[in-house]
Amino acid sequence: IINLIGYIDNNTFKNFTIEKMHQSLKINSILPWIIIRMSMQHMRNKKWGKIINTSSIGVDYGGGINSFNYSISKYVNEFIPIEIKKHFKFNIFYNVLKIGITETKIHNKIYNKSLKKRIKLVPMKKIAKPIDIANYIDFLISDLNKFINGQIIKISGGE
């Protein structure tokens, strides 16, 4: 299971509503957790499973001005419940990728001036390509990964 959902509603702390926050939580966090929960018994029976959930590097910095609901929903994904950890002994892997600024439709909508300013904050001074994230996911779900489990892993150019 790979959760790469990234719904953002451009709400600030000043203007968020319960309904909008619930929408972000439902899409980015609750629905993926339901899928994970529904899959656990099958993975346990097979004695194998790989789960990758995602968060955002913005969580470490209080999120962006227009991403209050998004940031909270991604922060929720960093929680690794004890119920998941109990399944590790059945060869089930669960990791969270905390992804930095990446060349996606969301970031391509940011004006060039704002995007350049944001990239300057990244120690590597560049934006990740989708293939950078895909390669890391490929490793984590491959047979090469035999011991990285229960981790929050940053893919953020040094942030």
Labelled PLM ranges:
Residues 12-13, 20-22, 107, 118:
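Substrate-binding pocket helix/loop in short-chain dehydrogenase/reductase
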Residues 7, 14-34, 48, 52, ...:
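Catalytic Tyr-X3-Lys loop
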Residues 91-93, 148-150:
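Short, small/polar-rich loop/turn modules that mediate ligand/substrate recognition or access, typified
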Residues 122-133:
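A conserved structural motif in NAD(P)-dependent oxidoreductases
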Residues 138, 149-159:
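Short C-terminal tail/terminal secondary-structure segment
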Residues 41, 82-87, 146:
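Alpha-helical segment proximal to the catalytic Tyr-Lys
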Residues 50-76, 81-82, 86, 101:
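Catalytic loop of short-chain dehydrogenase/reductase
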